[in-house]
Amino acid sequence: MLIKLLTKVFGSRNDRTLRRMRKAVTVINAMEPEMEKLSDDELKAKTVEFRARLDKGETVESLIPEAFAVVREASKRVFGMRHFDVQLLGGMVLNERCIAEMRTGEGKTLTATLPAYLNALSGKGVHVVTVNDYLAQRDAENNRPLFEFLGMSVGINMSGLPAPAKREAYGADITYGTNNEYGFDYLRDNMAFSPEERVQRKLHYALVDEVDSILIDEARTPLIISGPAEDSSDMYRKVDKIIPHLIRQEKEDSDTFQGEGHFSVDEKARQVNLTERGLIQIEELLVEQGIMEEGESLYSPTNIMLMHHVTAALRAHALFTRDVDYIVKDGEVIIVDEHTGRTMQGRRWSDGLHQAVEAKEGVDIQNENQTLASITFQNYFRLYEKLAGMTGTADTEAFEFSSIYKLDTVVVPTNRPMIRKDMPDLVYMTEAEKIQAIIEDIRERTAAGQPVLVGTISIEKSEVVSHELEKAGIKHNVLNAKFHAKEADIVAQAGYPAAVTIATNMAGRGTDIVLGGSWQSELAELENPTPEQIAQVKADWQVRHDAVLASGGLHIIGTERHESRRIDNQLRGRAGRQGDAGSSRFYLSMEDALMRIFASDRVSGMMRKLGMKPGEAIEHPWVTKAIANAQRKVESRNFDIRKQLLEYDDVANDQRRAIYTQRNELLDVTDVSETINSIREDVFKATIDAYIPPQSLEEMWDVEGLQERLKNDFDLELPVKEWLDKEPELHEETLRERILENAIEVYKRKEEVVGTEMMRHFEKGVMLQTLDSLWKEHLAAMDYLRQGIHLRGYAQKDPKQEYKRESFAMFATMLESLKYEVISTLGKVQVRMPEEVEAMEQQRREEAERLAQMQQLSHQTDENEAAEAIAAQTGDRKVGRNDPCPCGSGKKYKSCHGRLS
């Protein structure tokens, strides 16, 4: 109550921010007459003037009023479009490291030109980040005339571009590209073998479009570049044949309960667990198939990999559904993004899950992958000096933006008042009743000439609705991952009178639905249209536009609630753009996933008791409140998972930055001989100390062992025993010096054979190759450590602290191994001719190219590990003997981890 009163008196933080910025808008508006008087050349010259002022020490902030006024005037001349005052506000929000929430249709693309121009003046580059290649190309081409008019260059960073073209795109003042491509380029740059292979500059300013989709929805999926590991496809096929023999255990209170099954499914945590009966059954089947020996246990240490195959196969069958989580096209399993409904060509699930799904679908199984480099979007975007973003729906996630990215959210007012009518949800008992009600609603609205957009959460659901519409004889378009190429055309015409469009989730995001359809796309179909034809197309569009407005504008139908309120709001936001009329309604059933998992059984019980007749809907604030609570629960859980993922990745991030900094320094220098000499001294000291401990008696020395080690690991044949026999006065310090002197002498002779320049080149190549090889092994070791670390919770230890401690120890060991391996390799490799170094270099290049071609850009399912880690932290709470084991196995505690204690 008190907070509401204070907000009323002083205004919210959002109001105060906008009040401050409106003063600057007044200044920009006052400059407009002055800018209008400038000739085109004088307006263009302003860019050169601003850059000169920055060089003299002025700040970017001091240029805001004048720079924004210049961009607004240039936009009027190039596009015939003038930035509204609210767009100037949005531009200022984006310049202040904030998230700007701007409603659909408020011109986010034009707003972005203001901060992009302002921050590109420093010459350090601006990255505009979009969710797909189509939007990156569209926005770049649309804004190119404006930026080029102002003397700025524009680049497009597309996937699949060769390195020189990418370097050129990054060298531009303003670069457009997708979040994935920027992230993968960063990883690839840190795998380069020469400075010329790198494409990115220093990360200066990122302006993220649809920021909620990229920084929140995608934050659970790290970017991973991986290469092929050993082939185990045969095992996936064998294990896959066993899974259909297993029976899923239903809940005891369900109608289909038939006693204990073989495995249980936790839909909330996306986990599958074997029951006691299931373990016995699967062991018998594995023995029958000849995969496991009689009397062996699936949980024995020798069967760890087999357990991995069984778990992956169970998850593939029980949790992943064709046409919902993936599609099969041309004999290939392609992931469908759960957030956008788009197919993700080239992305693969990790942990053997993708191979298990391939075995299930009977397509060719591709090899498992080994991680070569990885980073989360959270850590990638925090590398930028300055980060900002815009979206139509950010306010529900403001806390997360603030706590993880240190970005405040500012809600920018609309240019015209919003008049869309959002109707309450209708809840039906069954899915079939709900679909029937949706069809009737569509029939009534299209009869009145009103366009309808139906939002579904999966390809499967969109095809069910499509099938029912076909039966009802209603013409419609389907927009889902299967028809990706036609996406923009379908969205452009979704505002036609009586048009019906079915869209998966947020497909078509970033393209406005114009009431009456898009006259631009009609013109694009005409070859060299005459002025009369253009006028006719526009006149026809105006008639259609007015007819749609009269019928009530675009109507949105949601076929079920999404896990996140934000994505529901995005669907609603497709209607009512720029003050147009519009309406929306969600249709739900008690069989929907969200209702089934989170809304309690009491709701369905209550509906049955009320004596609801088939086809009847319930519309009550209690139900709406129950749904909102369920969504809040899911959002809170997903936030915990993302936060957990980030806390673990922060540990790896510190190590990644240290390695990448070291690697880039190594790439930029030509002579690493000083470093080699320094680490040679460290390596030989440690090696000699292992056989001749400091300040020890001669009886404790293992001279023969030392001689053998020097010969085997460094190809150094030194008569250490002979020296000691002939010179009794030799003590450990002088002996160490003599061994080192001999090692340096042998190395110098090797250098004389190939020449100094070639040797420096060779040293650098060996260091890079060794660093990459050990870093790759370290990443795999970190993955294994991560998978089991949550079990430390049973020992009352904090898994995160344990992970930090152990991974640091592993990192320190890796650095020591790096020194040893480099000196050992340089000592053992016999180089007799300069051509041999060239040949080795060529071989390394070919191997790097081969790996690059086989690299996978994969989509990791880290949320499961994070969920496990959350679940395993039991603290001091005592687990009862008959309680379910906290590890999620489905067994009682006494039969699982309780037995161990």
Curated annotation (Swiss-Prot):
<dbReference type="GO" id="GO:0005524">
    <property type="term" value="F:ATP binding"/>
</dbReference>
<keyword id="KW-0963">Cytoplasm</keyword>
<dbReference type="GO" id="GO:0065002">
    <property type="term" value="P:intracellular protein transmembrane transport"/>
</dbReference>
<feature type="binding site">
    <location>
        <begin position="105"/>
        <end position="109"/>
    </location>
    <ligand>
        <name>ATP</name>
    </ligand>
</feature>
<feature type="binding site">
    <location>
        <position position="885"/>
    </location>
    <ligand>
        <name>Zn(2+)</name>
    </ligand>
</feature>
<feature type="binding site">
    <location>
        <position position="87"/>
    </location>
    <ligand>
        <name>ATP</name>
    </ligand>
</feature>
<dbReference type="InterPro" id="IPR044722">
    <property type="entry name" value="SecA_SF2_C"/>
</dbReference>
<keyword id="KW-0653">Protein transport</keyword>
<dbReference type="InterPro" id="IPR027417">
    <property type="entry name" value="P-loop_NTPase"/>
</dbReference>
<keyword id="KW-0547">Nucleotide-binding</keyword>
<dbReference type="GO" id="GO:0006605">
    <property type="term" value="P:protein targeting"/>
</dbReference>
<dbReference type="GO" id="GO:0017038">
    <property type="term" value="P:protein import"/>
</dbReference>
<dbReference type="InterPro" id="IPR011116">
    <property type="entry name" value="SecA_Wing/Scaffold"/>
</dbReference>
<dbReference type="Pfam" id="PF07517">
    <property type="entry name" value="SecA_DEAD"/>
</dbReference>
<keyword id="KW-0067">ATP-binding</keyword>
<feature type="binding site">
    <location>
        <position position="512"/>
    </location>
    <ligand>
        <name>ATP</name>
    </ligand>
</feature>
<dbReference type="InterPro" id="IPR011115">
    <property type="entry name" value="SecA_DEAD"/>
</dbReference>
<comment type="subunit">
    <text>Monomer and homodimer. Part of the essential Sec protein translocation apparatus which comprises SecA, SecYEG and auxiliary proteins SecDF-YajC and YidC.</text>
</comment>
<dbReference type="Pfam" id="PF01043">
    <property type="entry name" value="SecA_PP_bind"/>
</dbReference>
<dbReference type="GO" id="GO:0043952">
    <property type="term" value="P:protein transport by the Sec complex"/>
</dbReference>
<dbReference type="InterPro" id="IPR020937">
    <property type="entry name" value="SecA_CS"/>
</dbReference>
<feature type="region of interest" description="Disordered">
    <location>
        <begin position="853"/>
        <end position="901"/>
    </location>
</feature>
<feature type="binding site">
    <location>
        <position position="897"/>
    </location>
    <ligand>
        <name>Zn(2+)</name>
    </ligand>
</feature>
<keyword id="KW-0813">Transport</keyword>
<keyword id="KW-0862">Zinc</keyword>
<dbReference type="InterPro" id="IPR014001">
    <property type="entry name" value="Helicase_ATP-bd"/>
</dbReference>
<keyword id="KW-1003">Cell membrane</keyword>
<dbReference type="GO" id="GO:0005829">
    <property type="term" value="C:cytosol"/>
</dbReference>
<keyword id="KW-0811">Translocation</keyword>
<feature type="binding site">
    <location>
        <position position="887"/>
    </location>
    <ligand>
        <name>Zn(2+)</name>
    </ligand>
</feature>
<dbReference type="InterPro" id="IPR036266">
    <property type="entry name" value="SecA_Wing/Scaffold_sf"/>
</dbReference>
<dbReference type="Pfam" id="PF21090">
    <property type="entry name" value="P-loop_SecA"/>
</dbReference>
<keyword id="KW-0479">Metal-binding</keyword>
<dbReference type="GO" id="GO:0008564">
    <property type="term" value="F:protein-exporting ATPase activity"/>
</dbReference>
<dbReference type="Pfam" id="PF07516">
    <property type="entry name" value="SecA_SW"/>
</dbReference>
<comment type="similarity">
    <text>Belongs to the SecA family.</text>
</comment>
<dbReference type="Pfam" id="PF02810">
    <property type="entry name" value="SEC-C"/>
</dbReference>
<keyword id="KW-1278">Translocase</keyword>
<keyword id="KW-0472">Membrane</keyword>
<dbReference type="InterPro" id="IPR004027">
    <property type="entry name" value="SEC_C_motif"/>
</dbReference>
<dbReference type="InterPro" id="IPR011130">
    <property type="entry name" value="SecA_preprotein_X-link_dom"/>
</dbReference>
<feature type="binding site">
    <location>
        <position position="896"/>
    </location>
    <ligand>
        <name>Zn(2+)</name>
    </ligand>
</feature>
